[in-house]
Regions:
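Glycine-rich, aromatic-bearing surface loops/beta-hairpins
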Residues: 88-110
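A generic structural signal for short, non-catalytic loop/turn and secondary-structure boundary residues
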Residues: 20, 37, 49, 97-99
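Short linear loop/turn motifs
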Residues: 29-38
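Long, continuous compositionally biased terminal/linker segments
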Residues: 37-81, 105-110
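Terminal, regulation- and interaction-focused segments at domain boundaries
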Residues: 1-17, 58
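Alpha-helical scaffold elements within enzyme catalytic domains, especially in hydrolases
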Residues: 17-18, 77
């Protein structure tokens, strides 16, 4: 007998709306629990099972003032749409040599 795996459903459309409403940006890519904003400015990560707060990571190259303003807009829009978002730190995209793949290095604030 095969073991059934539970499928995790995320509120991608709500995150898409929050991102567009707050920053005027579209979603460039979504993979598993990660949602990448246009231009790689930030990543929103859906919480682990049972969690209620979205995690937000900004590109390490994003200017501090822009990061603060965008996060404040995201937090306000998330609240207005019944969600919460927390700033978790910065990330860096690293191109793998000779491959069309990237690694993502998260720099946690904790």
């Amino acid at each position: 007998m095969k073991e059934q795996t539970e499928i995790e459903f995320y509120e991608l459309e709500k995150v898409r709306f929050i991102t567009k409403d707050a920053c005027g940006l579209d979603i460039a890519y979504a993979y598993e629990d990660l949602v990448f904003a246009e231009h790689g400015l930030f990543i929103i990560q859906f919480p682990n099972e049972g969690g209620k707060v979205l995690n937000c990571w900004f590109n390490k190259d994003c200017i501090e003032l822009n990061r603060v303003n965008m996060f404040n807009s995201l937090a306000k829009s998330a609240t207005l749409n019944g969600m919460e978002i927390s700033y978790n730190g910065k990330f860096e995209m690293i191109q793998k040599d000779g491959l069309e793949e990237i690694d993502i290095k998260f720099d946690d604030m904790n």
